[in-house]
A protein has these predicted regions:
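Short basic, glycine-rich beta-strand/loop surfaces that mediate nucleic-acid
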Residues: 78-85
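Short, glycine/charge-rich beta-strand/loop segments that flank catalytic centers
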Residues: 64-72, 126-136
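Short beta-strand-to-turn element immediately C-terminal to the catalytic PLP-Schiff-base lysine
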Residues: 73-75, 104, 140-141
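Short glycine-biased active-site loop of nucleotidyltransferases that positions the nucleotide triphosphate
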Residues: 30, 71-77
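N-terminal accessory segments
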Residues: 1-34, 53-61, 66-68
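N-terminal glycine-rich flavin-associated loop
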Residues: 29-61, 85-131
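Extended, low-hydrophobicity, polar/charged segments
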Residues: 109, 138-142
Length: 142
């Protein structure tokens, strides 16, 4: 496969996803490795587009939630795209009588607990920095 660069990747994104481009910052650093591009998608469709285009351009992607535990696991030698999921922070469905809730990956544990508290419920897990730790990150790390 021909090696393509991140500039071509950015040009190929839909206008709505280009609006979610940000400059990489210290927030995106993983053990001193910084991406070239940072994206903050607003929907699962935008995540799908991001990953599809990144694959097409042979780019390495790292998902980032609350960025609370990025140093855990194998250190990347490089990555091209930071896929920041903290804008995906909605409750999709809540059925208190069934004790079930469906949420997006970027919702923080703190925000989820506040939502559940409205019905005198809670999620029986804890995580450091609950106001920043996302459900997606907590589940990924364990």
């Amino acid at each position: 496969m021909e090696q393509k660069n991140t500039a071509d990747f950015v040009k190929s994104l839909s206008p709505s996803l280009k609006d979610e481009l940000t400059s990489p910052s210290d927030y995106h650093l993983i053990d001193d490795v910084s991406p070239t591009v940072a994206l903050s998608p607003l929907s699962t469709e935008q995540i799908s587009e991001s990953l599809s285009k990144a694959s097409e351009y042979d780019l390495k992607v790292c998902p980032i939630g609350g960025a609370t535990r990025l140093a855990i696991g194998n250190k990347p030698t490089q990555y091209d795209v930071a896929l920041t999921l903290n804008k995906l922070d909605k409750v999709i469905d809540c059925k208190p009588s069934d004790l079930s809730i469906t949420v997006q990956a970027g919702i923080t544990l703190g925000k989820l607990q506040k939502q559940l508290q409205k019905n005198n419920q809670f999620l029986p897990i804890s995580a450091p920095l609950a106001q920043r730790s996302t459900i997606g990150g907590i589940l990924a790390i364990g």
